[in-house]
């Protein structure tokens, strides 16, 4: 998931 508060680490 490249969007949101953390655009990295998570899908």
From Swiss-Prot:
Tissue/organ expression: Expressed in abdominal perisympathetic organs and abdominal ganglia.
GO biological process: neuropeptide signaling pathway
InterPro entries reported in the protein's UniProt record: Periviscerokinin
Entry's localization field: Secreted
Residues with PTM Proline amide: 11
Domain of life: Eukaryota
Primary site of residence: secreted
Any one annotated GO CC term: extracellular region
Pfam families linked to this entry: Periviscerokin (PF08259)
Signal peptide feature range: none
Swiss-Prot/TrEMBL keywords: Amidation, Neuropeptide, Secreted
Keyword Secreted recorded: yes
Stated family: Belongs to the periviscerokinin family.
Role: Mediates visceral muscle contractile activity (myotropic activity).
The protein, known as: Periviscerokinin-1
Species annotation: Perisphaeria virescens
